Amino acid sequence: MAKEVDPCDHGEVVDAGCVRAVLAELVLTFVFVFTGVAATMAAGVPEVAGAAMPMAALAGVAIATALAAGVLVTAGFHVSGGHLNPAVTVALLARGHITAFRSALYVAAQLLASSLACILLRYLTGGMATPVHTLGSGIGPMQGLVMEIILTFSLLFVVYATILDPRSSVPGFGPLLTGLIVGANTIAGGNFSGASMNPARSFGPALATGVWTHHWIYWLGPLIGGPLAGLVYESLFLVKRTHEPLLDNSF
């Protein structure tokens, strides 16, 4: 991913590598959201808001999401880092591993990609209902918020442990392991908070449908959980005496 960088490096404005990275985030996030939303549509959106999705259908969505995340992070790792997710970008910004300028471009690209993917899906499916992240029946806003914080925390913790930490024994498998935690969290939290873990993944469907109910949860939760995971991992689990910088792959 990246060593510490100057958060205000304006030289990236004319950096061809930065442009390629932003375009990669646009393409990768588009495919990720397209796959995830399409899989959810194929599984069947419950007619009653907040109704639980059958476990078999939820497992299918989790598998599709996990495979997409693992493959796409691997594909984009050496170009943009394969963030696909504003929570990842903001977590790395908070710990000084990406510039503020590049992170802003990444988030803009991720949101644009998600919006385009969902709008295109509405056209390709003949106007089928686009699934929007919502709270499960009986789940209140604070419960949903805490759920999203925990799920995103676990996601970023795995990213740090398997990709960022130079001591990782399986760095090449880090993106695939990241996909596995995304799938596991989807099953664990899908029927409670929706298991977004990704503001961009929630933004596109909300924009395409105009349904913004509790949308703030899918921003605030991941943007708390992600940076918190970075703080905890770097403070407690990254061995300082080794003097090893975080893996530098222009993340």
Curated annotation (Swiss-Prot):
Keywords, sorted A to Z: Membrane, Repeat, Transmembrane, Transmembrane helix, Transport, Vacuole
A molecular-function term among this protein's GO annotations: water channel activity
Membrane topology: Multi-pass membrane protein
UniProt note on tissues of expression: Expressed in roots, leaves and anthers.
Cellular component terms per the entry's GO annotation: membrane; vacuolar membrane
TM stretches of this protein: 26-46, 57-77, 104-124, 144-164, 170-190, 219-239
Subcellular localization: Vacuole membrane
Residue interval(s) of motif NPA 1: 85-87
InterPro entries the record matches: Aquaporin-like (IPR023271), Aquaporin_transptr (IPR034294), MIP (IPR000425), MIP_CS (IPR022357)
GO BP of this protein: water transport
Superkingdom of the source species: Eukaryota
Residue window of motif NPA 2: 198-200
Domain notes: Aquaporins contain two tandem repeats each containing three membrane-spanning domains and a pore-forming loop with the signature motif Asn-Pro-Ala (NPA).
Family, per entry: Belongs to the MIP/aquaporin (TC 1.A.8) family. TIP (TC 1.A.8.10) subfamily.
Stated role: Aquaporins facilitate the transport of water and small neutral solutes across cell membranes. May be involved in transport from the vacuolar compartment to the cytoplasm.
The name this protein goes by in its record: Probable aquaporin TIP4-1
Gene that this sequence comes from: TIP4-1
